Each structure stands twice: as structure tokens, then as C-alpha cells.
């Protein structure tokens, strides 16, 4: 005989989904989400309807356009010609905003992302550039290679204005920049003896040759803080020390790209002889702009050829730069730091 006053309810229904293990059913009772690529599934117990499976849209339905090749344009190169399906993308990073909206598109069948280093209209000093935001944003878009284009002064007679150089070494004489993603409870020391990607550098040099542009396949780029140009004494010192070209931006990008495990190489467009050459006047901004205007078309051709010639395979060590660089015990890294650097360190510190 049944006891009076006691209502017997049927046990809660269970979710019988073929891809869900029995141990995960309890997750659904707490409204936890399982998130396949295109669908969020939520399973909850309703007092009258039993277990209900509902579909909800992802939090971010709009996906950012992806790109595999990032191009950073410097002085004189503020856009990239021939981009199909172009779209502006504005990205917020934990380090602030990039220099400019990034333009993504298709070149020679490959997706690229173009970023004007100094902003459109050349509004940002070398010291003011948010280098971390620039590299981080390109990483977020999926870039695994970065090609940089910049103006430089020559410290050698044989490196003439109008010619290009693909630097293989850098010397850092900057003073007022943050050139690392790390800190905040996480220490890392990446190997930087070879600061550029040899495979990418070879593609850039070969592309210059293909386009009929005289190119020097290696050289040492000294990076000064600026924005002033060198004194005569500094120019002679740089020559005495064996440096080849001088600029104000590339070494900071190269360091951050290495920490982000991105291939990086630079096309240095020679615009002047700095101030050391007795047969040439001291460098001026107007002189640089005039030479850059002559070289801009060459740079556009070289970039298109480089994108076309870029192999899908990577034969370098850039993508594993952090494998032996992270020093701090993962258990001691602050959660906020892990979250901030997740796109960079995620595969090492989930």
C-alpha cells in the first residue's frame, strides 16, 4: 500500500547523445556548454519538459578574416596594391591598438594581412609605434610569416640608394621601447643569434632578383631610436663597427616576432648615405621621401612575387622558438598573464 502524502516523480531524463560520454551528462545539468566548431549545445532539465537540448549561436558569430602572411609597410608604403576581397579589420589587443586597421585580402591566391607601421599619412614616430600590438594582432589573424618593408640609410659605398638589402643581422641601439611580450610573472629568453628567418629571407631576395631589383642578400641593420638622424660622429662609428644600413624600426619587430614564434624578414629599401659620404649631402626627410617614391613601385612588385613564391612548408625553427625559452614554473605564472599571452604560449601552458 502506497504511503499517503508522498509524490513519486520519475527520475530526471538523461541526454542520450552518441558523442557524449556518460561522465559528461552531469555537465549538462549545470548548463555547461560543449562548443563544436559551428554550434553551441545546451542541455538543461526542465521541471515539466524533462531534459531539453537547445541550440544557441556562438558568442562571436562574426569570425575575423584569417591570413597566413603578414606584411608591415614602412615609410612610403602605406597600402598594398592588388588585394582582392579586401577588408579592414580593427583588432583590440591586451597591449592596445595596432598602428592602423589591418587590411586583409587575397594576393596570388594566398590570404595576406597588410599593416601600415606608421599609420596612414605617416602619423606615428618610431618610438611611438605600438610594436607589441602590431605583432600580436597579426598573430591573432593567423599569420605565421611577417614580411617587413622599411627605409634605411646606407653605411657602405657599395650599398647605393635605390637598391634593396635583406638584413640577416641586427644591432639594437633603441632606448625607449618595450621589446618583449614577457614579464608580469613569466620569464622567457628566446634564442636570437639568427634574428631573421633564413627561408623567408631567401624568398625575398630571390623575388627581388626576379623583379629586376638590385638586392644585397645579407647585411647588418643597426636600429637607432630616432627620430633624429645620426650625428657625423655616430655615422663614422657605425661604419667603423662594420654595420651596413641604419634604420629605426626593424629590430623591435624582429624580437617580438621571434617571441610570437613567427617567421620574420625585412626588405630594407636604401634611400640615402646617411651623413658620412663626402659626395652626398646629409640626409633629410624630403630626400628620403623622394627616393621612396621611386622605389615604392619596385617594392609592390617584389611583395607580390614574394607572396606568390612563398612555400606552404616551413623549413625553419621559428615556430618552435619558445620550446626551450620559457623559464618560469607554469604553476607560478599568474592566470592574468596566461590569459593575456594565450595566443603565444597556449600550446606550452594551456
What are these regions (language model features)?
Residues 199, 203-214, 301-309:
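Generic non-transmembrane alpha-helical segments
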Residues 248-286:
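Zn-dependent metallopeptidase/amidohydrolase metal-coordination segment
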Residues 53-193, 349-350:
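Metabolite-binding pocket within alpha/beta catalytic cores that recognizes anionic/polar moieties
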Residues 315-350:
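A short, charged, Gly/Pro-tolerant segment at domain boundaries
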Residues 275-322:
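His/Asp/Glu-rich mid-to-C-terminal helical/loop segments that flank catalytic regions of hydrolases
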Residues 139-142, 239, 258:
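Non-catalytic positions within long, well-ordered alpha-helices that form the structural scaffold/packing
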Residues 211-244:
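Active-site/ligand-binding-proximal alpha/beta "capping" segment
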Amino acid at each position: 500500500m502506497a504511503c499517503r502524502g508522498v509524490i513519486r516523480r520519475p527520475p530526471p531524463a538523461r541526454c542520450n547523445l552518441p558523442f557524449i560520454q556518460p561522465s559528461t551528462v552531469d555537465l549538462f545539468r549545470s548548463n555547461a556548454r560543449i562548443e563544436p566548431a559551428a554550434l553551441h549545445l545546451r542541455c538543461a532539465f526542465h521541471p515539466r519538459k524533462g531534459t531539453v537540448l537547445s541550440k544557441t549561436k556562438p558568442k562571436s558569430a562574426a569570425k575575423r578574416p584569417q591570413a597566413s602572411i603578414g606584411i608591415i609597410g614602412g615609410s612610403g608604403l602605406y597600402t598594398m596594391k592588388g588585394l582582392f576581397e579586401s577588408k579592414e579589420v580593427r583588432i583590440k589587443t591586451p597591449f592596445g591598438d595596432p598602428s592602423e586597421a589591418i587590411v586583409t585580402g587575397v594576393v596570388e591566391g594566398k590570404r595576406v594581412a597588410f599593416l601600415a607601421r606608421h599609420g596612414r599619412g605617416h602619423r606615428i614616430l618610431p618610438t611611438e609605434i605600438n610594436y607589441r600590438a602590431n605583432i600580436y594582432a597579426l598573430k591573432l589573424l593567423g599569420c605565421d610569416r611577417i614580411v617587413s618593408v622599411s627605409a634605411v640609410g646606407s653605411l657602405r659605398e657599395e650599398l647605393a640608394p635605390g637598391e634593396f638589402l635583406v638584413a640577416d643581422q641586427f644591432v639594437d641601439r633603441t632606448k625607449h621601447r618595450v621589446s618583449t611580450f614577457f614579464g608580469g610573472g613569466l620569464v622567457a629568453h628566446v634564442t636570437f643569434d639568427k634574428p631573421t628567418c633564413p627561408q623567408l629571407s631567401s624568398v625575398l631576395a630571390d623575388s627581388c632578383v626576379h623583379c629586376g631589383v638590385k638586392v644585397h642578400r645579407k647585411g647588418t641593420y643597426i636600429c637607432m631610436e630616432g627620430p633624429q638622424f645620426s650625428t657625423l660622429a655616430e655615422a663614422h662609428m657605425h661604419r667603423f663597427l662594420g654595420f651596413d644600413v641604419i634604420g629605426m624600426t626593424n629590430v623591435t619587430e624582429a624580437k617580438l616576432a621571434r617571441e610570437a614564434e613567427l617567421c620574420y624578414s625585412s626588405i630594407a629599401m636604401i634611400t640615402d648615405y646617411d651623413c658620412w659620404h663626402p659626395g652626398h649631402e646629409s640626409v633629410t626627410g624630403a630626400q628620403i621621401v623622394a627616393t621612396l617614391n621611386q622605389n615604392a613601385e619596385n617594392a609592390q612588385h617584389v611583395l607580390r612575387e614574394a607572396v606568390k613564391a612563398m612555400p606552404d612548408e616551413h623549413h625553419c625553427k621559428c615556430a618552435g622558438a619558445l620550446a626551450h625559452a620559457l623559464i618560469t614554473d607554469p604553476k607560478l605564472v599568474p592566470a592574468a598573464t596566461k590569459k593575456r599571452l594565450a595566443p603565444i604560449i597556449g600550446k606550452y601552458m594551456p
